[in-house]
């Protein structure tokens, strides 16, 4: 079913406003971590402190092509460094929404890297598995080139996780109380499927009387083989035995999962209705509690669980979709999906209806891309009321 846009925005705002300020659900997020360096490629050095930049990717490409068979030297200037990685960005957004967050990832060797200092100040607890990965983002007027140094992600293993948290007992303590758990960036974290399998076999059985929400972000699985994707989806089925798995996808990821599962992308009047039907198909095939898809302009979700936090109410089976909060000239786009995921998971942790959680996710992302800042719950509610008119 689709929902009238303004009414849904108002209902989502009211649901957020009804959450007491003292309500702070616990969340655990892992396991990646990146330092993103934003870099200029110098065209002309004018002085020690002044230079002009290479304006476009095409200009840089022409210079590189001209150097073939010869050699060339390019000066790179780091303008600033910022927090990166699906986990840290999502964790930071959850903190802004008032959650008590434990962030686990490759956040620093021996000491937490300074780029993660704002997250370390806001989170309840930080657990580092090693030095962060690095992305060099060369920015131009017509786009950006991102060069990743991913070797540190090899430190994200089940054995290293055990060592960092104090063994099996420590890992059980880590997962015993959070209302929401998020394990993200599966594509780059090559051992994450194995970690899920160990958790399902050795840690989760008998651990809790309740079923936490377990958010999954595959993060561009096109880079992985079909066999790897199917193995990951099978591991999620094992996690589902002990938790309500929330599979979060963007449109490209949703289409790829449909392809891997031999499902046909639906034809519908609107993009969000097509995505809603796709979410229903994927959820029914995988037998997960939730499958959510956020598109550039809209979003959709399918569920089969009593969504109210008390499990005493809430439709146990359904789907929803809605138009979103697209803006022509965003201030920032990197991290927009992570913010949507944080807002959506926050809503679910508060027992808010999934259709309204879509708009809370959209408002969280919408505020972020317009301001480059993670919104509070109150700011997300204001955004929703403004959107409703």
Region locations from a protein language model:
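Short glycine/serine/threonine-rich phosphate/pyrophosphate-binding segments
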Residues: 86-89, 341
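Ribokinase/PfkB-type carbohydrate-kinase core domain
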Residues: 1-70, 75-86, 96-319, 325-327, ...
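Short, small-residue alpha-helix embedded
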Residues: 94, 256-259, 330-354, 358
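Short glycine/serine- and small hydrophobic-enriched flexible loop segments
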Residues: 92-96, 346-350, 363-370
């Amino acid at each position: 079913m689709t929902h009238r846009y303004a009414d849904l925005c108002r209902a989502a705002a009211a649901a957020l406003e009804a959450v007491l300020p003292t309500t702070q659900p616990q969340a655990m997020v892992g396991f990646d971590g990146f330092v993103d360096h934003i870099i200029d490629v110098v065209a002309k050095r004018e002085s020690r402190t002044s230079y002009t930049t290479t304006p476009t990717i095409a200009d840089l490409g022409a210079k590189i092509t001209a150097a073939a068979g010869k050699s060339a030297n390019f000066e790179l200037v780091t303008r600033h460094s910022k927090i990166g990685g699906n986990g840290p960005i999502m964790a930071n957004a959850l903190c802004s929404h008032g959650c008590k967050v434990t962030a686990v990832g490759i956040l620093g060797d021996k000491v937490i890297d300074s780029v993660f200092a704002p997250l370390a100040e806001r989170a309840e607890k930080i657990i580092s598995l090693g030095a962060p990965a690095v992305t060099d983002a060369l920015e131009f007027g017509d786009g950006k080139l991102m060069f990743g140094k991913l070797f540190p992600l090899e430190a994200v293993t089940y054995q290293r996780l055990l060592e960092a948290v104090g063994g099996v007992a420590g890992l059980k303590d880590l997962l015993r109380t959070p209302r929401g758990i998020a394990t993200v960036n599966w594509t780059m974290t090559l051992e994450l499927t194995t970690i899920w399998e160990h958790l399902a076999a050795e840690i989760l059985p008998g651990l809790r009387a309740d079923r936490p929400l377990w958010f999954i972000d595959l993060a561009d699985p096109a880079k992985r083989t079909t066999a790897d994707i199917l193995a990951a989806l099978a591991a999620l089925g094992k996690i589902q035995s002990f938790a309500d798995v929330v599979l979060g996808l963007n449109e490209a990821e949703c289409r790829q999962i449909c392809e891997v599962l031999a499902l046909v992308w639906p034809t519908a009047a609107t993009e969000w209705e097509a995505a809603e039907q796709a979410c229903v198909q994927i959820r029914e095939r995988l037998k997960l509690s939730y499958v959510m898809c956020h598109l550039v302009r809209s979003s959709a979700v399918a569920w089969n669980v009593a969504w109210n936090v008390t499990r005493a109410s809430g439709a146990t089976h359904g789907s929803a979709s809605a138009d979103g909060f697209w803006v022509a000239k965003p201030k920032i786009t990197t991290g927009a999906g992570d913010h949507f995921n944080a807002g959506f998971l926050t809503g679910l942790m508060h027992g808010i209806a999934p259709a309204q959680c879509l708009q809370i996710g959209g408002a969280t992302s919408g505020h972020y891309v317009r301001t480059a800042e993670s919104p509070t719950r109150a700011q997300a509610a204001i955004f929703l009321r403004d959107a409703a008119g």
